[in-house]
């Protein structure tokens, strides 16, 4: 995501309710003709000429005066008037809740902390107790609406951002459905606020009450209770089947299994405790591998499968903090309630809390007063046993299929890029396009998440980074038979960065095309007997198959974010620009013979080196630095038909 956020002091956030956040504007609806023209411009160079001509005719018919497009646009404007955010429900369903794929790798990103060095299990549990204490402190800030308001950085910096997502961090649960999941927010006048954490250990689940007799447990108390949980979990006579595996299955399969589970009251009670918890803390066994960044990330993404820590999870819960005995720590995130930047802000707050409080010695206290944590019980019929075996097998396939690498480019970082007077994010995106073209000889529809939190209840829209200008640049760079001088290649690089920056501004100001086309499509489902050709056309379908799925997730502390590809023949590319380096997490699938994460990482490296070489021309008097900011046009002027 190209927008970095930081929290300026003395601006207290208000409640997420619409009546208490009047300062933010509603998300605008872009002009219809602007979106249609931009859509054609985004796709023309990515599809065969004949296919494009057919699509162009379909788009012209859709957007004709008095046609279906204008009717749907009017309905969208009415929806904007009547709702807090006209796209949020459509977007949530399309991006997450309708998706039937398993959550590990396919949907749930992970944040990996710096490797810890635990001398023994007590060290591991002290870290976990410290972390839980930090969660409770942060949740108290949320509950009192005391966290500062985020402000945008990067393009159009300084504007306040919507804070609603923060209030879903500890109160959300993704309930599986047969055709569509439900995002449940634990706000109820009937049920009390959750006052427990679920601890996963040895694939067993335990209720850790964090408030007892109206008193929040101290870090020492939490440590005491965690020691009890480890002892209980190690009793093999008491061990129950690894029910958490079911949550790693496809969403429809898990919904089916849950229907079977809830027939028994014991299972219903256990599910209720998990669904209403603040968060999960997963006490992992050692992964048994060298603790490289790549291997630690894999432990967070899928747990290494059912034979390692893959069943020591409950993927429906929005936050699962992993504390491994081998020092592998981080958080697995169910993505539907909030975006990556919000997760990072929360996590950095927790880590800062932990650094401060870890200087104090944690001793067990109040031992005799604390009731023992409760093991969650499960009644497993032969049918459930069969479903568990099936889930385990499918998780193993996910583990085997993921091709993943963490790559650190350390020749330069965002300091050098800023010296070129251009956006680091735009520069990196152009490098990713060049890397893909080097490997595959073409550009493809690319997704880069762009925050629209400047608007009320805003989440993200898409920056389509595979611009015509990027194609001109990558062709020039890779055409070794061409006699094009480097000075002209430099101009093409400037053009590509400028186009990327323009599209970024368009996206963050609510003028991009993806959400708009989604809104028109979903309204068409409601008013038309069948979906219009505009949305069944191969070009439109292809435009939504993001072979390159990218996101900038910057951090100020030692940690990084990663996720999997979103299509079988695609790449996930999450990057974290630092002053003197850029960290990439590249993912793809072994099942696709065309893709390779290590080759892609190598191509990224080559692209950065070549682009730096062109930049040196600028510094040697052949041109000005790659200034882009002053040439950014306002969104309403970009890609006009």
UniProtKB/Swiss-Prot annotation:
Residues carrying Phosphoserine: 17, 366
Gene3D superfamilies: Chloramphenicol acetyltransferase-like domain, Choline/Carnitine o-acyltransferase, domain 2
Enzyme Commission code(s) on record: 2.3.1.6
Record-listed CoA binding positions: 413-425, 451, 552
UniProt keyword list: Acyltransferase, Neurotransmitter biosynthesis, Phosphoprotein, Transferase
Gene Ontology terms: cellular component: cytoplasm; neuron projection; synapse
Statement: the UniProt record of this protein carries the keyword Repressor: no
Intrachain disulfide bonds: none
Biological processes per GO annotation: acetylcholine biosynthetic process; neuromuscular synaptic transmission
Enzyme class: transferase
Catalysed conversion reaction: choline + acetyl-CoA = acetylcholine + CoA
PANTHER family membership: CARNITINE O-ACYLTRANSFERASE (PTHR22589), CHOLINE O-ACETYLTRANSFERASE (PTHR22589:SF14)
Pfam entry (one): Carn_acyltransf
Any GO molecular function: choline O-acetyltransferase activity
Keyword Phosphoprotein among UniProt keywords: yes
Region (Disordered), start-end ranges: 1-29, 619-641
Name this polypeptide is given: Choline O-acetyltransferase
InterPro entries xref list: Carn_acyl_trans (IPR000542), CAT-like_dom_sf (IPR023213), Cho/carn_acyl_trans (IPR039551), Cho/carn_acyl_trans_2 (IPR042231)
Task performed by this protein: Catalyzes the reversible synthesis of acetylcholine (ACh) from acetyl CoA and choline at cholinergic synapses.
Similarity comment: Belongs to the carnitine/choline acetyltransferase family.
Active site: 335 (proton acceptor)
């Amino acid at each position: 995501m190209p927008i970095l956020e930081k929290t300026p002091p003395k601006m207290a956030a208000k409640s997420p309710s619409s009546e208490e956040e009047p300062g933010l504007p509603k998300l605008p609806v872009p002009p219809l003709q602007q979106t249609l023209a931009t859509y054609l411009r985004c796709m023309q160079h990515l599809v065969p000429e004949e296919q494009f001509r057919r699509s162009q005719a379909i788009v012209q018919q859709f957007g004709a005066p008095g046609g279906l497009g204008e009717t749907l646009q009017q309905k969208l404007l009415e929806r904007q008037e009547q709702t807090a955010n006209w796209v949020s429900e459509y977007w949530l369903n399309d991006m997450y809740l309708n998706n039937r794929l398993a959550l590990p790798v396919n949907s749930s990103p992970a944040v990996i902390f710096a490797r810890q060095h635990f001398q023994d299990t007590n060290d591991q549990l002290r870290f976990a107790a410290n972390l839980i204490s930090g969660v409770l402190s942060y949740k108290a800030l949320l509950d009192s609406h005391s966290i500062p308001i985020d402000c945008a950085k990067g393009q159009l910096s300084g504007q306040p951002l919507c804070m609603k997502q923060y209030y879903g961090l500890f109160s959300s649960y993704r309930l599986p459905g047969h055709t569509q999941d439900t995002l449940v927010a634990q706000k109820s006048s009937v049920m009390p606020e959750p006052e427990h954490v679920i601890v996963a250990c040895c694939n067993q689940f335990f209720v850790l009450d964090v408030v007892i007799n109206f008193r929040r447990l101290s870090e020492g108390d939490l440590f005491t209770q965690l020691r009890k949980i480890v002892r209980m979990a190690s009793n093999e006579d008491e061990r129950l089947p690894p029910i958490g595996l079911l949550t790693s299955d496809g969403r429809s399969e898990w919904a089916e299994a849950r229907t079977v589970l809830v027939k028994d009251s014991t299972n219903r009670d256990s599910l209720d405790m998990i669904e209403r918890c603040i968060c999960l803390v997963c006490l992992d066994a050692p992964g048994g591998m060298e603790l490289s960044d790549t291997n630690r990330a894999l432990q967070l993404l899928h747990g290494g499968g059912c034979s390692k820590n893959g069943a020591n999870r409950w993927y429906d819960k929005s936050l699962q903090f992993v504390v491994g005995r081998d020092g592998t720590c981080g958080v697995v995130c169910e993505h539907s309630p909030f975006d990556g930047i919000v997760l990072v802000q929360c996590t950095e707050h927790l880590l800062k809390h932990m650094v401060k409080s870890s200087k104090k010695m944690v001793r067990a206290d109040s031992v005799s007063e604390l009731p023992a944590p409760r093991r969650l019980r499960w009644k497993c019929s032969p049918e459930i046993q069969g479903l568990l075996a099936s889930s385990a097998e499918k998780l193993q396939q996910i583990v085997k299929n993921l091709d993943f690498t963490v790559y650190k480019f350390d020749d330069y970082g965002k300091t050098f890029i800023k010296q070129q007077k251009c956006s680091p994010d735009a520069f990196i995106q152009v490098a990713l396009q060049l890397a893909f073209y080097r490997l595959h000889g073409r550009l493809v529809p690319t997704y880069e998440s762009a925050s629209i939190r400047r608007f009320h209840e805003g989440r993200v829209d898409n920056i389509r980074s595979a611009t015509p200008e990027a194609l001109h640049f990558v062709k020039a760079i890779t055409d070794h038979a061409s006699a094009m001088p480097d000075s002209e290649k430099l101009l093409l690089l400037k053009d590509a960065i400028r186009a990327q920056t323009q599209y970024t501004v368009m996206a963050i100001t609510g003028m991009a095309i993806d959400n708009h086309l989604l809104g028109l499509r979903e309204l068409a489902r409601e008013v038309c007997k069948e979906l219009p050709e505009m949305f069944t056309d191969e070009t439109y379908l292809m435009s939504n198959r993001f072979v390159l799925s990218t996101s900038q997730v910057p951090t100020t502390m030692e940690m990084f974010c990663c996720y999997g590809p979103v299509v079988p023949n695609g790449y996930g590319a999450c990057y974290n620009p630092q002053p003197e380096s850029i960290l990439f997490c590249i993912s793809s699938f072994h099942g696709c013979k065309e893709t390779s994460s290590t080759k892609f990482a190598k191509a990224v490296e080559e692209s950065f080196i070549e682009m730096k070489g062109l930049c040196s021309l600028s510094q040697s008097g052949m041109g000005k630095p790659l200034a882009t900011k002053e040439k950014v046009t306002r969104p309403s002027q970009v890609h006009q038909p």
